[in-house]
């Protein structure tokens, strides 16, 4: 995504969760954007409301979160970063584009073996509205449902 603040994090967390659920080994999910901003707090709250354990590791302009999807697995480390951040892989990965703006603006992702657009509407348009929590949950569940289908089709 462009700002690596909402959809890409929801997708990272749900993809890693689905890989674990379907017992697909050697899948490690990351997120990145064309810009680094911050993981939007409503994303962490939405994930927590869906049953994930969320802990803030560091509080600053770009907080770092520990996101547990299973008691027996390492947590996902969530923070906003650019696609080429040292935290992300440099080669042998598939780039899933969750934002149509980034999909159009990034025709080439260095190191990606595959580039797959699965775009979602940005829940940002509901920030600071009475529908915010509902719409973030709706988007999170849409992403979870799509990724459930994707990972159910993979033969481990």
Residues of each region from the PLM?
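Short polar/charged helix/loop
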Residues: 5-156
């Amino acid at each position: 995504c462009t700002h690596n603040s909402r959809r890409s994090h929801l997708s990272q967390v749900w993809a890693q969760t689905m890989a674990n659920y379907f017992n697909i080994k050697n899948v490690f999910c990351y997120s990145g954007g064309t810009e680094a901003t911050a993981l939007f707090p409503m994303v962490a709250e939405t994930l927590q409301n869906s049953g994930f354990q969320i802990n803030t590791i560091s509080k600053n302009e770009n907080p770092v979160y520990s996101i547990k999807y299973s008691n027996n697995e390492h947590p996902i480390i969530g923070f906003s970063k650019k696609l080429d951040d040292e935290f992300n892989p440099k080669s042998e990965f598939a780039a899933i584009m969750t934002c149509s703006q980034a999909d159009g603006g990034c025709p080439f992702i260095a190191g990606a073996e595959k580039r797959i657009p699965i775009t979602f509407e940005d829940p940002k348009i509901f920030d600071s509205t009475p529908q915010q929590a509902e719409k973030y949950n709706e988007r999170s569940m849409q992403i979870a449902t799509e990724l459930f289908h994707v990972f159910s089709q993979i033969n481990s």
